[in-house]
Structure formats: C-alpha cells, structure tokens
Amino acid sequence: MKREMKMNSSELIANKRKKLNLSVKELADALGLGVDGATNIRNWENGFGSPNKQILKKIEMFAETIPFEQNKTNYKFTFIDLFAGIGGIRIPFQELGGKCVFSSEWDKFSQKTYRINFGESPAGDITQIESSEIPDFDILLGGFPCQPFSQAGLHKGFEDTRGTLFFEIERILQDKRPKAFLLENVKQLKGHDGGKTFSTIMKHLDMLHYHAEAKVLRAADFGVPQIRERIYIVGFDRDRYEINDGYNFPFPKGVGNKTKVGDILEKDVDEKYTISDRLWQGHKRRKVENRKNGKGFGFSLFNAESPYTSTISARYYKDGSEALIEQKNENPRKLTPRECARLQGFPDDFIIPVSDAQAYKQFGNSVAVPVIREIAKSMINEMNNWE
C-alpha cells in the first residue's frame, strides 16, 4: 500500500509538470516548498519517499491546464501587451474577448511567469523589435517606466522622447496606427521633472492624432484592499473615430464595494513569513528615528479588519515594511506571495512559478487587475458605440 502511494504521487507530480511544461524548480516554487523544494520534487517523482498529506493535497489541487490560454479563433478584437510584466493588464482585455497577438517583456523571471500562465513566451527587449515584426492590432497596452526626457519642451518633433521607453510606444503607435491604447504609470508621472514629462507625453500623443486623457485611480475603490494610486492614459485614433472637441472619456468611478484586508489573507501561513526579532526591533527603532527626523513613519502594520494596506512595491521582498500583518503573541509577518497576488486582484488560479523574492518583485511591479478591467469595459463600450 505504501509503495502504491509513492507510485501515485510520483505519477501525479510527473503528469502535472508535463501538462504545464514546468521544470522541477518551477513546480517547487509554485508550491512554495522552499530551498529544498526542487530536490524533494525530484526525489518524489523518482519514487524516493512521498510528500506529506498537506503537500500532496496542494499538488492534487494544482492546475492541470494553462490557466489563461486564449481562444485563438473566436475573438472580438486584437491587442498587444508591451512591458507586459506578468500579464496583469492582459487578463481583463482577454476576458472581454480580446486576442493578444504580440507581447514583450525583457525580464527573464517575468517571462517565465507569463509563459506558464498564458502559454506564450513574450518577445524580449522592445527596443530591438521592428514595428514590421508586430502583427496589426486594435489596442496597444503598456505599463511603461517613468523616465525623464532630457530635452523635454525644447523641440517640436519627436526628438524630445528619443532614447526613452515611451519613444517605443510612440514609434509603434505611429507605425501601426491602432484604434486605441491604454498606458499605466505611477501617479507621480504628472509631477515628474516639474510636469515636463507628462506634458511631453500628452503633446506627442496629440501630434500622433490620438485623443488622449489621463486620470489617477485608486485600487481600493475597485474592490481590492490596497491604496495603490496609479495614472491611466486612454487614447483613441482621431483619424478613425469622429471625436467631438468636448468629449470626455468615461473613466470608471469604482465599484463601491467596501474592502477589508482579511478578505485576501490566507488561513494557514508558513512561519517563514513571520519577521525575526532582530528585524522587528530594527523596524521599531527606525520608526522612532524617522518620526524624530520628519522622514516618514517607517513600517506599516495592518490586521484583518483594516480597510486596506499601503501600496506594495517591487522592494517588498527586502523587509516587508510597506505592509506587515499583525499576529497574536508573535512578531508581525510579511504578506505571502499569494496574498500579494490577491492584493492586486489576480485570480487564485494564477500560477506563481518563481521564488518568493521574485514573486514579490513581480506583483509589486504589476497592476491592480480590477482597475484595468473597469477601464477596459469603458474603452470597448466606447469603441463599439463609434463603430
């Protein structure tokens, strides 16, 4: 009987890996098995020992198909996913009937997460890809980095933005002429470089004959318990659509649901997420020092009843100070990668095939999916009304 259990678990693991095209390490990371996870998976798969009941249950519950594989024949519109990260912007547009015909992401760990969840490997550095290599499409999506324009406002042509990643968006808009676009950035973009960066972006989008509007939206207003304010720029091709001078894009106002941190917390959390005595004492000491020096307030502590957390960023993996969770009779703990995924509105069937450190970076760099979903609905509705 014992041998049968080993055979069953080894076959189960092998089948899961084969169906999802996962390496031993990718499956171990996705299951949260820690530093010895890959070795354990390899041993179990080869019939040496077997996982305990808790891990076996995790393996049994694990996906057997690519979670977000798109329908390549039945679709309503097409889009491309630039600076794609792990696909947070893609998910809602695909849900609404869109087909992704091209994606680009340079980070190899994000590429891995993207491939495993969507069944496609993004192209690499967009600066090395010619517009002619990109299929025609209807909507451009991109969460681009905020960079200064060295000569912003001094020229009348497109030299203002050359050498920045926004230039790559501009180049593709000019060459491919999609019907619409959605860009996402940090809310500080508006004030970056004294406002020159934002005004240059909007000026150049206008020069390309796109009607563009921008608005800062807060994730907590869209059903996820995280403040996370971001700026969203929506644009439509004026040469294709008759857009009145007084037109205002109907940015969504939110969904009105009250949020609570407890809604995204896992029930059974590994002790490894509890911060050490040394780190906790350091957090408290720095908080006192920062208050004295007027440099901010240091760590942020939340519990299940808190309406929302502060914004998680790519640096969350370092010490978790942005959002620590209270625990009874213990030091506080960091959010788990799955909790970070939920904080951004990612579905629970989204696979996390990387280490905790990489997962924190990926979700910290990603978007609040529910915000994108509501913007996408408004965009598609407007385009359908015009066509």
What are these regions (language model features)?
Residues 12, 23-26, 55:
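Residues that mark the N-terminal boundary/hinge immediately upstream of a DNA-recognition element
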Residues 32-50:
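Recognition helix of helix-turn-helix/homeodomain-like DNA-binding domains
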Residues 27, 33, 38-39, 278-387:
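C-terminal target-recognition/interaction regions appended to catalytic cores
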Residues 65-177, 187-190, 196:
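Core alpha/beta nucleotide-donor-binding catalytic domains of modification enzymes
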Residues 129-139, 147-317:
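Class I S-adenosyl-L-methionine
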Residues 17, 28-31, 60:
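The alpha-helix within a helix-turn-helix
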Residues 48-70:
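DNA major-groove recognition helix of helix-turn-helix/homeodomain DNA-binding modules
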Residues 1-20:
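A short, Lys/Arg-rich alpha-helix, primarily the initiator
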